[in-house]
Amino acid sequence: MASFFQSFRSSSMAKQLLRFALSRLDLLDTQALDLENLDFALGRNTVLEFRDVGLILQKLERLLGLPPAFSLQKAKVLILRVTIPMDFYASPITAEIDGVDIRLKVASKKEKDRQDAGKRGKGMAGSEAVPTAADLAQSFLETQPVAEKEELEQALAAETQDLAASMAASEPESDDDSPVGTGQPLSLPVFLTNFLHGIVDRIQIRVQSVTFQADVEVAVDSNSPVPEPVTFQLSLDNINVEGVTSTSETPDEASTIVHKEGKRHVLLDNIRAALITETNVLSSLARSASMPSSSASRSPVAPRSPVDNETTAFNPSGLSRSVGSSAMAGSRDSSDDLPQSQHLQDNEAAFNIPYDFGDSNEPNEADEASPLSTPRASLYRGSPPPTITDHAKSAVLEPSPLIWSTAEREAQSVPFLRPPEGFPLSNDPSPAASVHSSSTNRSSGSSARDDLAESHIYSHEDAESMYMSAFSQTGSQGLRTGMPGAWDAFDDAEESETEAGPSTSTQAAPYDGSFDPPQPDRIPSPEQPSQDQKRNSPSFYAQDSSAEVPEPPQDDIPTPRGPTRLVKQLLSLSSISIYLPSSHKHVKIDTPDDGKSISPNIPGAFSMHSAAATSPKPTPADEPAGETTPIDPSIEIVLKPVEIQFDASIGFLLAMVVAQLLEAAQGGSKDAAGPTAAKPPSASPDVKVTVEQLSVLFLEKLAGVADVPQRFFEKSTPDLSSDVLLQAQVVDLRGSVSHDGPQTEMDFSIEKLKFGYANDDIVSFDRSVLMFESVANTFPSAGQDISVKATMGPEISRLEVNTLPLYVQLDLQKLDEVFGWFGGLSSFLNMGTSITANTSRADKSPANPVQKPKGVRFDEPVHPDDQAVTRENKTDLRINGLQVDVLGKDCSVMLNTSAFKLVSREGGIGIHLSRIRLSGPYFKNSRAEPPIVSEVLDTRVEFLPSPRAKDLERLLELITPSSNKFDEDEDEIMVDTLLRQRRKGSVLSLAIGKVRFDAGNLPQLTCLPSLIDDLAKLGTVAKYLPEDDRPGLLTLCHVKNAECRVDFGGRFGAILTSLTDLEVAHISMPQLAAVALGEIAVTRNKIEELVVTSPPPQTGPWQNLPVFRLRLIDDMEPVLKIKLMGLGLEYRVPTIMDLLNLGQDVTPEDYEAGLAASVASLGEQAHTVIKRASSGSLTSTGQAKAPRSLKVDVAFRDCLIGLNPLALPSKLTVALTDAHLEMVPGPQELVAVTTMKRVSVLLIDDISILESPGVRFTTSRRPPVVISTQVAELCTMGYVNICQISSAKATVTVSRDSQGDTQLEVEVRDDLLVLETCADSTQTLITLANALTPPTPPSTEIKYRTTVFPVEDLLASIRAETFGRAEGEYDLDNDFDVPQELGDDADSDLDFDAGPSDSPLNLDSQYLEENIVQEELFDATSSSMLREGATKFEDTNDGVLLSTAGLDNPSSSGLEISSSDLSITDDYFDKGPVGRGTAHRWDSKTDRYDQHNEIKLQRSPLKLCVRDVHVIWHLFDGYDWERTREVIAKAVKEVEAKAYERRAKTDRRGGFDPEFGEDEPIIGDCLFNSIYIGIPSNRDPKELAQAINHGLHDFGDTESIATSTVTTSTLRAAGQRRRSKSLRLDRSRRHKITFELKGVSADVVMFPPGSGETVNSLDIRLRDVDVFDHVPESTWKKFATYDLDAGERELGADMVHAEIITTKPADTPATEMVISATILPLRLHVDQDALDFITRFFTFRDETAPIHASPSDVPFIQRIVVNSIPIQLDFKPKRVDYAGLRSGKTTEFMNFMILEGARLVLRRVILYGVSGFDRLGDQLNDIWTVDVKRNQLPGVLAGLAPVRSLVNAGSGFRDLIEIPIREYRKDGRIVRSLRKGATAFAKTTGTEVVKLGAKLAIGTQNVLQGAEGLLVPQTGESSSNAAAVAAVLGDDWDEAEYEEEINRKFSLYADQPLGIVQGVRGAYASLARDLSVARDAIIAVPAEIMESEGAQGAAAAVLKKAPTIILRPAIGATKAIGQTLLGATNSLDPMHRKRVDAKYKKH
C-alpha cells in the first residue's frame, strides 16, 4: 500500500480533493478564499491562514432550517488557520478559528408581514444537506481526468494483489485466529471515502471567541407604539474539538482534555448568556412602589473599582499545538523578513475615557505585530502556527481584574470595544515570531444592517471622519477604518470586520500619547492558564440593536456621552464536554511500511489483514498488548457547574423574549415539517448526560454593567450572598438514553435537589422525615434523591420515578419578606400578568376567524396501524413520603403523608395516599401536643380527560336526583346541554376512606387566623392560573366515613360529629356545586345527641336516601338549594346553657335574652356569608357587575326537631314532613321565609319507652289523616300525634337600625293548626313547655312588691287643668279605685271598685231609678261604659264596650254628652294593630299605662307578629299515657278489693250490721284531681268498671285494660291485649269537645334595655271563638259562641282581646305581669255531659310531674283587669248528685232546672297580686259566683224553660206601654208612638206565642215517640244490622263504635224549615210518612192473626201493632204542627234560624 500512497502523494489529486471538499462545504465565502490559487505541498507541514472570512448566510439559513421570522444579519470568522501536517493520513489536520460572530434578528410581526413570502420559500426549496464523505469522493472522481483515475486504480489494484500474496505467504500454519477469506479488490471511491473519513476523524478544531447575538423587539409598554430593542447574547471562550484518534501529549493537556478511546472530545469552555437592553426597559419592568431605601440607593450598574495596578498578560492558548520540531525551526527562520505593523492608539478625549491603557515608562517594549488585514490565505512552510490565547473570563458580578479580550471583538453591541491594532496575535515577543505577510488593507465595505440605534444622531461616515481626524497617524501599514466604541460599515456585497489582537490591562497612568505593548516576561504559559484568569475574565460585551433604517445625518447635534444600555449576565457555564463516537474504524499508521497493511479493515477487503510488524512498537504499560478496550458508542455530555441568575425585571423580560422567539419559531414549523418528515429515519445514538451542579438564583437585584468601554477594565464587587432571594440547586444530575432495537431506555438520577433561600431550604429530599414506614416503600439507590427510568417502544411507553421523602418548609414570614420587595406575592404576580397582557395586547392583532366550509364534515377515522395512537403510555411516580411544614409568625402546622403514588395511563392519572396527617399549631420552644390532629386514610385521586358513564350518572344523581327531587315544582335543568358540555371536559375523582379530626385546647388556636391570612396571600396564585376555553374541571369527591371531635373544654365538653357517604361535585366553569350526605350524627360528651339521622322507613320509596343535599348553579338568579331528609335536631336546655356560658343561677328571662341574641347573631352571620358568596363566587370574572343576591332555598322532608325539657323524661318532637325555608339577603337586611305545608307535633311522656325492648304499640284507632310513614312509625314507638300544621308561613327579618343594633322581626301566618290531646297529654305538654327554660333559682330576698308606694306629696300631682268645667257625670267610686274599708284588709287578694257584700255601695241598678249613679264594675248595662272615654280609662278605644252599651237599657242611648268631652282621634283607622309600631307600657308607681315611645319601640330588638291563624283544638276523652292508665287500673283494683273485703265481713256477720249502714263512708279514691273512684255500700263492686266507663263516655275506644292483669312494673304496651269491657281508658276514637279559634293574632314586642321597667308586651286577639260539643249523648252543637242577640259586632272587633305586659320594677328581682282582658258577649249551650268532660279534662293534675319545676317559676300577676262579660246561658242537666246534696253541695240544685236564655253578667274585676293562673281561675270563679247568686238571680230565674216564653211575652206588654211613652217624650206624636208600641207588642207576643205552640207540638211528639219506643218491643233488627256491618268491615269492625253511632242523638229542633212554606211542605211529607207506617201496620194485622194459632196469638198480634196504629198518626200530626209553627217562627224572626243552627246538631 506504500507504493499506492506514493502514487497518490505524487499526484495532484490530494490537493484537488482538499479544494473540492472546501468548495462543496459551501459555507465559506469561496471568492474571498480564492481556492483556485490555494496551494500546498504534501510531505511538509503547511499552515493556511484566512482573515475576515464570511459565511454564506443563505446557505447557513438553509442548513439550520430557520423559520421565516429569523434572519441572519452577519456570520463571520475573523481568523481561520488550517495546519496540514506532512503525514496527514496519520496525523491530525488542525483548524484554528479566532473570533466567530453570528448575529441573528427576529423580525417583529409587522416586519414579518412586510417580508416577501416567496423569497424565503424559494430559498428553502433548494435546501441541501451537508455532504458525506462518500458523496464527496464520488463527486470528486467524476470531476477528475480519466487518465489520473486509471493510473490510481492500477496502482491500487497492484497494491491489493501484492498485499494478498504477502498475506498468504506470511500466514503461520498454527495461527487459527488469522483472518482469511476471499476479499474483493479495494476500489478507488471506497479508498477515497475511507481516506476522507480518516481525515475527518483525525481533524482537530480550536475555536476562540464565539459570539451569538439575537436581536428582538419587545413591546414592554402597551402605551408606547415603538417596541424596545433587546439583545440576547451567547458567548463562548473556547471550543476544542479533539480528533478521534488523538492522544494526550502532556500531563497538563491530559488534565484539561480528558481523552476517551474512539470518541471525539468537544469542549465548550466558559459559556455565558446575557440580555442587553436599554436602561428604561428594565426600570419599567422593575417595581415602582414599596422599595426599601437601601435598594433605592443602589445603581442599576454594578459598582466598579479602579483599574488594577498589576498588568495582566494576554494568554493565547487555542493554537499552541506544535506539529513538529523541524517545522517550527523552519517557521522561525522564514519569518525574519516580514514587515511589522505600527501601533495605533485610540483617543481618550473622543470617548471621555479618564484612564490609560499602559505605562509608557515600561522597559523592553515589544515590537508591534503586523495587522491581520488580508482576507487572502497565506502559505507557511515549516513554521509553527501562531497561537491565539484564551481571553480572560469575566463574571460581571464577581471581583476580578478586567483585561482585554479577543473573544468578542466583533460580537459587541454598539458602542463596542476593540484592542489597539498594534497588539500582536502571537505570544512570541520577537518580531520574527510573526509569520504573517502584509497585504491589502481590510475591506472597507459595511452592511446597512448594523445601523445606529435611535438614540445615536451621527451617521457612520460622519463619525468615522471625526474619528480619523482625531487619530490621524502615518506609517501604519494596516490602518483600520473602524473606531473603538463605534460600529463598522458594511455593504451588500461583502462583510468585513477588523480583528482585535491580544491586549493587556496595565496600570492607569496619565496619557502620554503612546501605547506600550505587553512585556514578554509577563506573558504566562499558554498551556497553563490560571484558574483566576478563567474565573475572572470578562464575560460578554454589549451589542448594538439598532433599527434597520438609519436616521438622517444631523451634524448640529452633539454626540451623546451617557450610556443608555445595560448588560446583565443570565447564564454562566464553566464548560461542556461532548464525546462523539466515530462510526469509522481506524488503524494508526506511523510511517509508510511495505510490510504492513495500511487499512485492513476497509469495507470490501474482507481477506486483508495486517502482517506481523518487523519491529513492533512498544506497548504502553497501562494498555497490555493483545487486549482491546471496547469502545462505548454513546454520546457523552458533561456539563460543569451551571449557574443561572435573574431578578424580577430580567425574568419578565426574558419571558417576553422567549415567548416572542417561540412565536416566531412556530411560524416556520409548518414549512419545515414537510421536508423533515420526508427524511428516512436514522438510528439515534445513545446519549449520556452529566450535570455536575446546576444553580438557579433569583436575585433581589441583578447587577449589570453599562454598555461602555470602561466595563472591560474596571472591577465590580457586588455581594451576591445578600442579594439571593430564592435559589434552586441540582447536584450530580446523570442521565442516559440507550436504544435496543425499536425500544429506547432512559435513566436519570439526581444526587441532591434543593430549592429555597440563600441559607435555608424550602423543598428538599430527606429520608429522616419519613413518618409512616411501610414494607411497600422502595427508595432510590444510595446517594440519590431522585431516580427516573423511562422505556419507550412501539407498543408501550413507561416512565418510573422514585424519590426519597419530600420535605417542604414554607416559612410564610420569609416568603412575605422575599416578595415584600415587590409589594407582596399578589403584586408580583399582578406585575407579571400586566406585563404579559400588555405585550400580548401590543403584539397581537385580532385574527380573522376562519370560516368553515358549509356541508357535512366527518372526522377522519383513526388508523389501526398508527403507533402514536395505539401506543400505551404508562407513568409511575412514587414519592416515599411527604412532610410540609408551614411556619407562621407565632406557630406552625405540619402535614405528613405516607408514600405518594401516582400512576398515569392513557385513560387518566391516578394518585393514592394511604395516610395523611395534619397537625398543629406548634409553638416555638414548646413540646406540647398539638391541639388539632387530622388524619385521612385511603385517599385515591383520579384525573380523566373525559368523564365516564358512571361519573355522569353520579353528577346527575347529585344535581337532579330522580327519586328525591330538590323541589316538587322545580324547574328542570337542561340535562342534555350539561352532558354535552361535560363530555368535553375533564374529571377529577377523589375517594377517601376515612377522615378523623380531633381538636382540643381551643385557646391555643388564637394564632391560626394570622396563619390563615398568610396562607390566603399564597392562595391568590390560583387566580393567575391560565384559563381554558374548554368546560371547567368536574370534581367528584366521595368520603365514606368522617369523624370530627372538638373538645371545647369547661362545662360544654366535647362534640363528636360522624358523617357517612359524603359526596361532593363541583364544576368550575360554568359554576356548579352539589353535595350529598348519607348520614350524620352529632353527640355531646358521648351521651347527648344533638343531631341524628332518623332511621329510614321500613317501607316506601324513600329508603337509603341522603340526609343532606346541596346544589348551587350559577344563573341569572342563583339559588342555593338545600334539602334535608330524615335529619333530627335535638334541643336540650343544659346544652344551650353551657353553650351560652350561663350559670346555674340564671333566670328564664336571661336565658331567653341570650338565646334570642344568639339567634340574631346567627342570622347576621348567615347574611354576611350569603352576601360574600353571592358577591364573590357568582360574579363573572373580568367584568364589573353588581353582585347578584344569592337566594337560599332549604327543603325539609321528614325532619325531626326534638325538644328535651330539663329534668323531665318527656319529649316533644316536631316532624317536618314538608317544609321550606327561603333566605334572600338584601342590601341591609336578611329576609327568611319558612313555609310549612305538613308538620306534625308528637309527644311522649317517657323517652325510656323508645329504648326498651318489646312489641311496638299498636292501636286500631284509625287516624283521620295519615300524615307520613315516619309519623306512623313514631306513633308505633310510643309517640302520640298531638298537632298537625298545614299552610303555615313564618317570615323572619334580621336588620340593623340606625345605631347599629340588631333587630329581629318575625311574622307568622297559619291557615290551619289542629291540636289533639287528652287530659294527661295536655298537662304533659304544659309541663314540658315550662321546662324548656331553666328554672328560677330559689332566693331568700323579696321577689315581688307587696306594699303600696307611699304618697310623699299629694298636692304635687294636682294640676290646674284637671279642674276644668264641672260638666258631665262623675262616679266617685270609679275615680277612687281602692275603698278605705278594703285597704285595711291585708289578706284580701282582690280589689273591687265597689266592695263585697258588706260595702254600702253594693246596690243593684235594676232596683234603683235612672238618675241614681250606678255601680260600674258590676253593671254591664250601665251608661258608664260610654263615659270611659270621657273619664280617660285605658279602654277608651275598645269597640266591644261601645257595641254592647245599650243592650238592656235602650234609654241610655239618648244620653247627652258634651262635645267637649269627646276625644277625637283623626288617625284612628290609619293606625295598625298593637305591635306594628305601638305597644302599651306600664308604670308600676302610678299603676297606670305609660305613654308609649315611638322611637324606643322602633328600636325593639324583637318583634313577633302572629296573623290570621286558624286553631282547632280537639279534646279527647281517655288517656294517652300507659302510666296514667296503669295508675287508674291499679286504683280500681284496690278499691274493688276493699269492697269485696267489706262485703265478705258483712256476710260473715250473717246479716245487716248497723255499723255498715247507709251512713257508712264510701270506699273510694280520687286520682289526678279529676277521677273519683268510689263504691257505695249498697253497690256491687263489679259495677265499678262500668261506672267509670260510663263516666268517661268512651264509646269510641277499642282497647281496654283488664284489672286482673295490670301490673305496676309494666311501662311498655305488651302488644294487643285481650278484649275486656272492664275498663276502657285509651284515647277515644272521636273527640268530645272542639275549640275553634279563628283569626288568632298576636304581637310580641321586646323593649330595648334601659327603656323602662316594661320588658315586653304581648297583645293577643281572637276574632272568633267557638266551642263545639261532640259528646254523643248531647244534642247541642256549640258549647260556646258569640251571642247574636247582643247585636251586630263592630267591624274588625275581636271576640277576645288580651294584653299582657311583663314588667320588672326597679326594686324587685323578678318579673311581674299586668293583664287586661276583654271578651264579647257569649252564648253558652251547656250540656251536663259536656260540662263534666271539660271539668274533668282541665282539672287533671299529675302530682309526680308538676307544671312548674320551681315555685319561683309560678307567674306573678301584679294586676289583672277583666272587663264585664255578658252571658246568655242554656243549660240542660241530666244527673243529680244526691250524695253531694247531702254533703251540702248546693250547686247541685242547678241540675234540677233547665235553663233557656238565662242572662247574667260577669262583672268587671280588677285583681292585684295573684300567683299563678290556677289561683286566678279559682278567685274569679268565687267572685263571679257570689255576685250572680246575690245580684243576678232574677235574670237567671227568668231563663227557666217553663217560664221563658211567658217572660218573653210579658216583655211585649212592657213594650206596649214603654215605647209610646218614650216616643211621645221625644217628639210628642201620639199616633206614631202608639203604632210603634203596638207593632213591637204584636211582634214580640206573636212570635212568642208561635214559639210556644211549636214547643208544645214538638214536646208532644217527643213524648209520643218515647211511648212508642216503650210499647213496641225491639226486634233483632239492630243486631242483624250490627252483624251486617261487621261482615262488611271485617277487622275494622268495632262494636263500641257501632254502639256510639246508634246511640248518637239528635234534637227535633234541628234542621228547621226556612219559612212557613217549607214548614208546610215538611209537615205534609212527615204526616204522609207516618200515616203510611200506620197503614202498613193495619194491613199487616190480619196476616199475623191468620198466622197465629189461637186467640192468644191473635191478641198478641193486635197488641203488637196497636201502638203503631194508634200513635203513628198522632206523632205525624204533632210533627206536622211543629214543622209548620217552626217555619212560621223563622219567618217572623229571621235571627231565630241562626240561633238554632248554632245550638243543635244536624248530623
Swiss-Prot record:
Polar residues: compositionally biased ranges: 308-325, 470-479, 528-546
Region of interest (Disordered), residue spans: 111-130, 288-341, 353-392, 413-458, 469-488, 493-563, 839-863, 1370-1400
InterPro entries the UniProt entry points to: ATG2
Any one GO molecular function term: phosphatidylinositol-3-phosphate binding
Keyword Endoplasmic reticulum assigned: yes
UniProt biased composition (Acidic residues): 1370-1392
UniProt biased composition (Pro residues): 517-527
Bias type Low complexity, positions: 288-306, 434-447
Basic and acidic residues: compositionally biased ranges: 448-458
Keywords: Autophagy, Endoplasmic reticulum, Lipid transport, Membrane, Protein transport, Transport
Compartments it resides in: Preautophagosomal structure membrane; Endoplasmic reticulum membrane
GO-annotated cellular components: endoplasmic reticulum membrane; phagophore; phagophore assembly site membrane
Bilayer topology annotation: Peripheral membrane protein
Task of the protein: Lipid transfer protein required for autophagosome completion and peroxisome degradation. Tethers the edge of the isolation membrane (IM) to the endoplasmic reticulum (ER) and mediates direct lipid transfer from ER to IM for IM expansion. ATG2 binds to the ER exit site (ERES), which is the membrane source for autophagosome formation, using basic residues in its N-terminal region (NR) and to the expanding edge of the IM through its C-terminal region. The latter binding is assisted by an ATG18-PtdIns3P interaction.
Protein family according to the UniProt entry: Belongs to the ATG2 family.
Name of the protein in its database record: Autophagy-related protein 2
Organism: Chaetomium globosum (strain ATCC 6205 / CBS 148.51 / DSM 1962 / NBRC 6347 / NRRL 1970) (Soil fungus)
Gene: ATG2
